[in-house]
Amino acid sequence: MLCRVDEGWIALDFGEWEEKPIGEITKEEWIRWRSDPSFMPPGGESLEELDRRVALGCEALLLEAEESNVAVFTHVSPIKSAVSWALGTSEQISWNLSVGQAQITRIAVRDGRPVLTSFNETGHLKKP
């Protein structure tokens, strides 16, 4: 399998909020972040921007995935955006999805359309 880096799949840019404790973010900003997909943390990107970026990545892989298996290794927010894309929902669904570490989510291509076939698989991980 060919490996390549695609910047479209990088983590959500939280800007000045990166690694900042939630308690240091104002209540007003947090409420806006959770309710307004166009809101951007200072110096970061919005959920709308993330969804557009990931949707472009998904569309680019659609034809390739019809011919062979494709694997994308990425972060929580792009995974949520890819699921939103596959389901045809809005970016707000991300608040209703929980993505674990090292999990597997599968999106198949059937008749040229995305189909979510599994979400948040962890069966491949060793039990503690």
For every predicted segment, state its role.
Residues 29-49:
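Short glycine/proline- and acidic residue-enriched helix-loop micro-motifs
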Residues 51, 55-63, 83:
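Generic structural signal for well-ordered alpha-helical scaffold segments
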Residues 68-74:
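Generic beta-sheet signal
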Residues 1-30:
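Phosphate-coordination/substrate-recognition cap region in phosphate-metabolizing enzymes
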Residues 12-23, 63-68, 84-128:
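Acidic, low-complexity terminal tails and accessory targeting/binding regions
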Residues 76-77, 101:
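Alpha-helix N-cap/helix-start capping motif
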Residues 50-51, 72:
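Conserved anionic group-binding/transfer micro-motifs
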Residues 11-12, 78-80:
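Short, active-site-adjacent cap segments at secondary-structure transitions
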